[in-house]
Amino acid sequence: MIQLKNISLSYQKPVLKDLQIQVKRGEILGLVGKSGAGKSSLLKICAGLQDPDTGEIYIDGSKQTPVRHLLVPGYHGIAIVNQDFKLDPFHSVEENIREAILHWPYAKRDKRVKKLLNLFGLNDCSLTKAHLISGGQQQRVAIARAIADQPQYLLLDEPFGHLDAHLRQKLSKYLMDLRDEENTGIILVSHEGQDVLGLCDHICILQNGKLSKKYSPENVYYHYKAPDRARLFGPLNTIKINDAIVHFRPDEYILSEAGITVTFQNALFVGGLYLNYVRTELNEQVLLYAFQKLTAIKAIEIRKK
């Protein structure tokens, strides 16, 4: 288990404030926060690439001090893929992965490379030079190379940043397979909460230098006490009913004669569903998901999860 205790870090201003975090093998933990929240710095501290101002790091119960000298990526079974990862552009996909385990016996090394090519869907481009493949394929090669030496933990900084929706879905599957097949603990940083909802076992939110407790994906999605935080994970409606302010997700409603009346304005087809833009009688805009466009005027009843 990677465990961080009382971690604080400042540059010109405090970035991380007395944080606690832990991730076990076989767990995918998502770290979500806005750009500039300190997520990348926290990931580097986990990897031993940066010292905190204060705090302690434990790997499988063993305290690591000083961090940067002892906690070298790979040395304690930790691998990291930064946002600005680099491949050898003139080596093939297979060679880029193979170079990470040149110290392995040949037969074992060859078997491992073949497994990773298959796991990450890279068989078709295995002999292609790295600079000739797509950004999504390069991302998968970088992750395959990072885990080639069978690290116990994998740290990923914004792995979905330059991928389209289809490739994001495929990468999510590869990471879940990695967790399930090799019992790898994964910490995944993202500023887009929707990227981690269907992937992570637990999610923590980094905001104003503080790290939240671990939430399940369902709990964090339907937790509205902090609307700004909730909006990190998808559209959130806010309307006034009588004297109460009500928050609800676009899927938390039914068509009902007993509900409030809304007027249809526009609709976008997104991911197999229509995102309907409607307005309430108080002229508040509301987003509603449906399998079809809503008609001009409907009554909706909010059903809280």
Model-derived regions: residue spans:
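Non-catalytic connector elements of ABC transporters
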Residues: I245-K305
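Helix-to-loop junction immediately C-terminal to a conserved catalytic motif
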Residues: A47
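ABC ATPase NBD coupling module
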Residues: Q64-A79, H103, V220
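Conserved ABC ATPase signature
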Residues: K129-I133, Q137
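Conserved ABC ATPase "signature" region
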Residues: K108-C125, D177
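A short, proline-enriched helix->beta-strand linker immediately N-terminal to the Walker B motif
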Residues: A148-Q152
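ABC-type ATPase nucleotide-binding domains, specifically the catalytic core motifs of the NBD
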Residues: R68, K86, H91-D110, L119
